[in-house]
Amino acid sequence: MPISEVYNMDCVGYMKTLPDNFFDLAIADPPYRDSKDNAPQKEMRTNGDIHRFGDKPENVFFDELKRVSKNQIIWGANNFGIPFKGFIAWDKMVRGSDRYSQVEIASISDSLGTVSRYVQVSCAGKNKIHPTQKPVALYNWILDTYGDKIKTVFDPMMGSQSSRIAAYNRGYDYYGCELDGEYFDKGNERFNRECHGVIKRADGTVVEQMCLFDGL
């Protein structure tokens, strides 16, 4: 059974406790709005509730991410001025919709190659728990495509925990952070519908969980 540890805490603080190159692959989906800008933050709905994006991360986030991981995939890299050669273009298959972008770009670090890839995975779904939730199938594709280079996966802002579910199903050790307590709890509930891992609070204490297969 693979390791699956998640932390309800700030990811930068967590990364600062780790040695260099601790993870084989980091997959990040950072918010891209800045509350210091005059423009209002973008709002999105999940199951009828309105949520706001968090602030765009500071440079220290990207510096730490590259320090603690050997390879990086960063969604929305084109919004952060990050130079990259290879990228993933995710076609969300939302034809005729002007509400959100139809294609999303993720940079891939040079260590993963400079070949750009195009993938079609539907983002349709009624039970989303996070405004920027990505489908498990997308993360399955990422791990299947780049899995020969990795054993451990890190998601610093895991949100809905799609990346965690994919890593568990593919047998990779996984570590993740989520600062928002509500998203953290909802993500854990979602994860537990399929698998069983270890949840730790910011102080390191373990939250006991019930395995779905206990008693069956």
Where are these regions (language model features)?
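Class I S-adenosyl-L-methionine-dependent methyltransferase catalytic core
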Residues: 1-154, 160-216
